[in-house]
């Protein structure tokens, strides 16, 4: 069975050129997510998409602390991709103060994604039910939930909507993850 990496931050690596080449050499299908439109733009400027590497336009909810969501920049980049990620909600203690800002940005992104039929890579820490609600309200049909850590009831509702989940080894090493 061929695995697909649906959540890889190429820009996190100092030796990103090496990883770009290695992914292509291994023929490993990979979705390279980004944390902001600026990072997405930089990745697209440095690297071309290949059969094995696609870039996703993102706005990580954790960015809301440092960098306001720029709708115009997001709208300018959206025609260049069918993939959106990393986007979502993070209501953990460190980011809960920006929950309203996160919701506003995520609603905007979900509305665009539904219209464009884009595939989303979604962050949902401590906000799983709200994330599900926003995806459904916007009519998003194509989403991959990244590193899910919520309850089983919400998990089943996400599955009922036809959403997918990205699973990694670290997730499976905890009791809750298993």
Regions found by a protein language model. Name each.
Residues 1-178:
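Mid-domain alpha/beta scaffold segments of enzyme catalytic cores
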